[in-house]
Amino acid sequence: MKILIVSKCPTHPTDAGNRWWILSQAEMLISMGHEVHFLYINELPLKRNAAPYIESLEQTRKYWGDKFHLFTVSKFQKYKMIAAKLYRMKFGHNYWKVDDQYPFGLEQMVNELDGTIHFDVCIINY
């Protein structure tokens, strides 16, 4: 089977539990003979030093090679998501709609990848 794993969390360096889980999941699926691709949702921080994020991105890209796909959240989109978060906190009693933090354009990219590669399974990780 062709499998797409989608995550905002890079797989490398494997120095946190969620990264370890995603990589272990991928390696298990690969060991079973499946073709596994990784779509990384890149959301750079606005105020923090971006160097560690860029380093993680490069290490993840290197590991996955041609099975690596990148979706980058624009700064405008990031500000929009922050505004929605602040609005929900102030006026919505922290009630969130399911798509409040869903990056615009991600669905289109997944559909384009699926149209080209024809995935059988799509796994979404945190």
Q: What residues fall within each predicted segment?
A:
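N-terminal subdomain of nucleotide-sugar transferases
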Residues: 1-68, 115-116
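Residues that line or immediately flank small-molecule/substrate-binding pockets and catalytic motifs
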Residues: 7, 43, 72-75, 126
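Extended hydrophobic/Leu-rich segments
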Residues: 64, 68-70, 76-79
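Conserved nucleotide-sugar donor-binding subdomain of glycosyltransferases
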Residues: 74-126
